[in-house]
Amino acid sequence: MTLITDSESIGVCESSYTPEEERRIVTELNNEAEADLKEGNLYFVISNRWYTRWQRFVGLLTEEFRSGEPSEVTRPGPIDNHDIIDSESDASDPQLRMMLEEGVDYTLVQQEVWRKLVKWYKGGPPVPRKLISQGFYTKSFSVEVYLLCLTLTDSRDESTTIIRLSKQASIGQLYEMVCAGKGVAKEKARIWDYFEKKKSVLLDPSSEQSVEEAGLQFNQDILLEVDGSASSQFVMSLAENELAMVPLEPMRSDAMDIVRGGGTLSNGHSNGFKFSFFGRNTFKDDVSSRTFGKGEKRGLGGLQNLGNTCFMNSTLQCLAHTPPIVEYFLQDYRSDINAKNPLGMRGELAIAFGELLRKLWSSGQNTVAPRAFKTKLARFAPQFSGYNQHDSQEMLAFLLDGLHEDLNKVKRKPYIEAKDSDGRPDDEVAEEKWKYHKARNDSVIVDVFQGQYKSTLVCPDCGKISITFDPFMYLSLPLPSSRTRSMTVTVFYGDGSHLPMPYTVTVPKDGSCRDLSNALGTACCLDNDESLLLAEVYDHKVFKYYENPRELLNGIKDNEHIVAYRFKQMHKGPGKVKLEILHGEQEKSSDRGPKCFGTPLVTYINKEPLSGTDIATSISGLLSPLRRVHMSCVVNSGNENGHVPDESSRSILSRDTETEDNDRELSLSLLRDYYSFNLQPLESDSVVNPGSVTKVLVKWNEKEHEKYDSSYLNDLPKVHKNVLAKKTMQEGISLFSCLEAFLAEEPLGPDDMWYCPGCKEHRQANKKLDLWKLPDILVFHLKRFTYSRYFKNKIDTLVNFHIHDLDLSKYVKNEDGQSYLYELYAISNHYGGLGGGHYTAYAKLMDETKWYNFDDSRVSAVNESEIKTSAAYVLFYQRVKSDSETSDMKMD
């Protein structure tokens, strides 16, 4: 029996087009699609790993080695989307893994481009998504990558069904989908919003409202009831069914009592409060329990994660523990709402935020589901809609801007012509600019968060100096980035002589695969007649071989798994091809084929017809270090002192304890390709014509696990693991050094040149920033994420920041006599890498010194000594007023 080669079995359609022709065709198709954007256009989600390889192949991405030489590229294999597909999803209906990021994990290509790529390269699986229109004031197009996922409970038999639909689908369309799937007449069906297994709102079958506007959240429950069927266990209590009487504005005298623990807020009548009737779909957020004990602390409520909303929850908790903001929103702020501001959200965002803040401060230590706020956020900021992970600082920037516009007391903004400083004193110009700014922008956000900095531009040619004073809401501070990176790579022996061993090496951040190979060679004592083959392992398969020494390392992410296969030079060379050995085992609860596990092994074989016995012998040699040692062998091989041999000696010893007959008992199958995972049994008399890479699957059963220790194949370490261990102050950098880097003089970039009024030309001027006026609430954004054309990176450097007595006086150029001493009260943290990770918040209650960790719905106390970590991303400080300022306030 003759088996075809792997390159034939994959069925790759070798394109007759050159790379240049492929690039031209795709570029033309993209231009045509851009000119014809409309709702409903179809796009396909494609693995960014594969697409980046294709871009390099056709010249859409070009990389250079540090010497300036271009990096060589090879033609990519079949399209492989398995790295972005949830491994637990059905093969007939593949679902994307959660928390994927566009440009990092996946790329979107329009339908005609997808068709061409599939024609040229085959592969898949296809993941189609539609273009939708979003936005309230201005419409924008976006591809709905993640559909809304709902769990439908049928009250008749309590069965559950997963439903996926567009967030823009109407409630009426939801009824049609459910009724069609359940075979129920629409007029007999009732669908309830069943959030947290509670019947809260009966959805209207005739409603054109979208499921997103109705407040339905990712992975939440909905309940189907059918007329004439019993469903008593789903009866809703009267309290759940009535319209909420949401307290809008407490009287000023009681507001801070709530914050400090006095007084109560309820969901019913209470003296001293004004009420407004709202339906569930506007401002009635769900609180898991509306009662709390007497004297229970307020402000310790958690926020439920509604589907990758930890970024939002982190920001909200920091703002919900900002004293002047809490005080303002717990008092009567309605008179400040500017519903007619064309730059605002008609006051809806401010009211949604105010009601959410009120829930947090009235819920004791219970959890609040911010559904109404998220619905408003998605309406006015479609970039935060859907279920992708986002940036907490970007969320903060939008929210502060949005709240300002909703609460801007200026109804008509006067036109004010900008004036140059013309040599006038700085304090005069700064005061004038601030006055003009306040004439157009007057809100609590400006009063609390906004400061002013001085910007000085100097023309390098004529010496013209231009000084301006501009407002700021927060300070984005640069972090110094290391020029090197550490990488952990596991080395496997291609001849099966030793056990695999992980090595951690330091390489240049902009280095190449040659740098990594050289560093690994030194670490593992590579002989002169040996070489290393680098590869990326994903989902227990070899995703890519790094055979070009010039290929840059910046394409390797920290969360990836890289291995190196060690070979004698004699094992490689002309006439040799790769034999790739994968490991699989049958899942007991599944009737599908074997599931891969562990790390593939790689060796080289002759490029000539081979028998199944030849293949089995090669595989047995690679597995030999993993053979378990029988106790009798260990005892007999010990030295006279009874010492047990080391692992390498034991593996060699055990190899001699097995017979060649046992070597051939392995269950082997030829793997045609990763995409279809089509297996063909490999018998001893089979004849294999090797291709460039021949893939063979070893099926492990109890016998194999008894004979071999597969633990050495598992637990492959990541390239770099983010460790948030406690570090000393000397290991990090100070917040002051970051601030000084922000304020340092530097030339403008070539793409950001300044028009010099003296030269009448654009010049690459020198720019210097100085702090002039600092706000009561000062926010520092630590710029941990860096972006370049080919690479995105997170800087995990520990920033040593002050918790108490942050004195910024020497950085403020305005001598106004104010105190610029600050106390830290909240931190937005980011854990993990790019395109995902997790956000939390540290915050302390007003009038308390105790800190708390807000991790979505989980709230716990934390020691002050533990809040300084390399996860700190956004720092919130409150200014400590001087004695004279405090006295002036008392007199007022």
UniProtKB/Swiss-Prot annotation:
Residues 301-880 form the USP domain. Keywords: Hydrolase, Protease, Thiol protease, Ubl conjugation pathway. Coiled coil: none annotated. InterPro entries: DUSP-like_sf, Papain-like_cys_pep_sf, Pept_C19_DUSP, Peptidase_C19_UCH, Ub_carboxyl-term_hydrolase, USP_CS, USP_dom. The keyword Hydrolase applies. Residues 643-657 have a biased composition (Basic and acidic residues). GO terms for molecular function: cysteine-type deubiquitinase activity. It comes from the Eukaryota. Residues 69-89, 636-660 are annotated as: Disordered. The active site is at residues 310, 838. It catalyses: Thiol-dependent hydrolysis of ester, thioester, amide, peptide and isopeptide bonds formed by the C-terminal Gly of ubiquitin (a 76-residue protein attached to proteins as an intracellular targeting signal). Its EC number is 3.4.19.12. Belongs to the peptidase C19 family. This is Putative ubiquitin carboxyl-terminal hydrolase 11. It comes from Arabidopsis thaliana (Mouse-ear cress). The gene is UBP11.
